[in-house]
């Protein structure tokens, strides 16, 4: 259905049991009524009477409860269990060499079978990782082959579909302390390996599980971030750039990445860059420089909320998992809470009412926080395409030209490829 409708490949699917519908789900039904529901102070609901949808103020205090986020970052174990990885080629599973475990190419799709123990019982997880540049046939085949593998194992495994850039913490932890490496595109299939670019930039960041992920990003200085470590490779030299707020885990992850890439690098602490370093990135540029201590980041991780009134009521829903640029809906207003500041991001197609409600809700959100937030916490408004480095820095692998192509065209292009 997602493919046929031309929706983005990363569209999330949520399964709801009967009588377990969420408020967000119910908003899309004009005449939804729960069993024994009443209007007002006990007035019985009349089935043939449909009330007019009114703009009801949203209770922002409920946003401070975050069970979805806790579930998203759950760890069944420490990632040291047995694993098998296959790459999808010609609609078949092809085993990946163990020496290449942990390396994922954006032009491929993979199936990862993981075995774990819980409460003395054996369990399995099937991760289906789908690259941004993977073809429609590969994506379809990965889903079918994952279902077949599940059947072969008796239907017991947990199946997890993973879109590039939305890797859960447990998946990142599976590679023996080495970083999970995600190449921007290309493929690793036999006889069809993509030639590496002359200049490459990798961003190394720690996940909530304490393991690192190395993501290839555009090789521009604006993608640097004081909170992370970076690896920059060129034909003449390579560099390990250490941000002031980066951790030892990230620094060590960058060193492991250098070993895998087969290059040696000069270590450059932030603030001690050479002209050659800046030259390889096309010159200096603004980037996120306000280093934030990692313990503070762990205590107050960034949270993203989508604001919409498309159903006739203004609602706000938290985006689960690690945030990515894909989560910013151009027809909505988004709230990004970085603790020290709350950003109101305005999509180009957002409605005027959404903008007004979102700004007001940002202030109410701060005031109602049970953690006793400083009421003076600044609220910044930024528009799509004009995001400052202080906003961009929270998103891993930000692409400056992401919205140059219409989302529907991008989705259709992915399907036709």
Swiss-Prot record:
Subcellular location: Cytoplasm, Cytoskeleton
Source domain of life: Eukaryota
One Pfam family in the UniProt entry: Gelsolin
Membrane spanning stretches: none
Stated family: Belongs to the villin/gelsolin family.
Annotated positions binding Ca(2+) 8: 331-332, 354
Disulphide-bridged cysteine pairs: none
One cellular component term from this protein's GO annotations in UniProt: actin cytoskeleton
Any one GO biological process: central nervous system development
Species assigned in the record: Xenopus laevis
Intervals holding Gelsolin-like repeats: 93-171, 213-261, 316-392
Comment on protein domains: Comprises six structurally related gelsolin-like (G1-G6) domains, that, in a calcium-free environment, are packed together to form a compact globular structure in which the putative actin-binding sequences are not sufficiently exposed to enable binding to occur. Binding calcium may release the connections that join the N- and C-terminal halves of gelsolin, enabling each half to bind actin relatively independently. G1 and G4 bind two Ca(2+) in a type I and in a type II manner. G2, G3, G5 and G6 bind only one Ca(2+) in a type II manner.
Biological role: Calcium-regulated, actin-modulating protein that binds to the plus (or barbed) ends of actin monomers or filaments, preventing monomer exchange (end-blocking or capping). It can promote the assembly of monomers into filaments (nucleation) as well as sever filaments already formed. Plays a role in ciliogenesis.
UniProt main location, coarse: cytoplasm
Record's protein name: Gelsolin
Tagged with keyword DNA-binding: no
Residues where Ca(2+) 7 binds: 227-228, 250
Keyword Ion transport: no
CDD domains noted in UniProt: gelsolin_S4_like, gelsolin_S5_like, gelsolin_S6_like
Keywords: Actin capping, Actin-binding, Calcium, Cilium biogenesis/degradation, Cytoplasm, Cytoskeleton, Metal-binding, Repeat
GO terms of molecular function: actin filament binding; metal ion binding; phosphatidylinositol-4,5-bisphosphate binding
Binding site for Ca(2+) 6: 150, 155, 157
Binding site for Ca(2+) 5: 107-108, 138, 187
InterPro entries the record matches: ADF-H/Gelsolin-like_dom_sf, Gelsolin-like_dom, Villin/Gelsolin
């Amino acid at each position: 259905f997602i493919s046929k409708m031309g929706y983005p490949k990363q569209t999330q699917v949520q399964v709801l049991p009967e009588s377990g519908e969420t408020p967000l789900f119910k908003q899309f039904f004009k005449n939804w009524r729960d069993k024994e529901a009443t209007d007002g102070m006990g007035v019985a609901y009349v089935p043939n009477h449909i009330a007019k949808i009114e703009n009801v103020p949203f209770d922002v205090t409920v946003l401070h409860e975050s069970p979805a986020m806790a579930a998203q970052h759950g760890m069944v174990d420490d990632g040291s269990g047995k694993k098998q990885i296959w790459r999808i080629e010609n609609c078949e599973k092809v085993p990946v060499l163990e020496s290449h475990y942990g390396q994922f190419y954006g032009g491929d799709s993979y199936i990862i079978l993981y075995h774990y123990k819980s409460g003395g019982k054996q369990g399995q997880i099937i991760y289906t990782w789908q690259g941004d540049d993977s073809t429609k046939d590969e994506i379809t085949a990965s889903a079918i082959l994952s279902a077949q593998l599940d059947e072969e194992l008796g239907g017991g495994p947990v199946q997890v579909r993973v879109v590039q850039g939305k890797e859960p913490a447990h998946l990142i932890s599976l590679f023996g302390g080495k970083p999970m490496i995600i190449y921007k595109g290309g493929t690793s299939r036999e006889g069809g390996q993509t030639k590496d670019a002359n200049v490459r930039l990798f961003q190394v960041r720690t996940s909530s599980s304490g393991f690192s992920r190395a993501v290839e990003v555009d090789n521009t200085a604006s993608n640097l971030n004081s909170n992370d470590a970076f690896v920059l490779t060129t034909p003449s030299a390579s560099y390990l750039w250490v941000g002031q707020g980066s951790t030892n885990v990230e620094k060590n992850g960058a060193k492991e990445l250098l070993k895998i890439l087969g290059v040696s690098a000069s270590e450059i602490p932030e603030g001690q860059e050479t002209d050659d370093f800046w030259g390889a990135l096309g010159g200096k540029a603004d980037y996120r420089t306000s280093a934030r201590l990692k313990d503070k980041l762990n205590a107050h991780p960034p949270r993203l909320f989508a604001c919409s009134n498309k159903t006739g009521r203004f609602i706000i829903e938290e985006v689960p998992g690690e945030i990515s640029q894909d989560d910013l809906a151009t027809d909505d207003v988004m709230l990004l809470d970085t603790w020290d500041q709350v950003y109101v991001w305005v999509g180009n197609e957002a409605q005027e009412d959404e903008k007004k409600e979102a700004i007001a809700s940002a202030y109410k959100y701060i005031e109602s926080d049970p953690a006793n937030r400083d009421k003076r916490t600044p609220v910044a408004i930024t528009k799509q395409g004009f995001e400052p480095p202080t906003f961009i820095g929270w998103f891993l692998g930000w692409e400056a030209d992401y919205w140059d192509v219409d989302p529907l065209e991008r989705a259709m292009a992915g399907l036709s490829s």
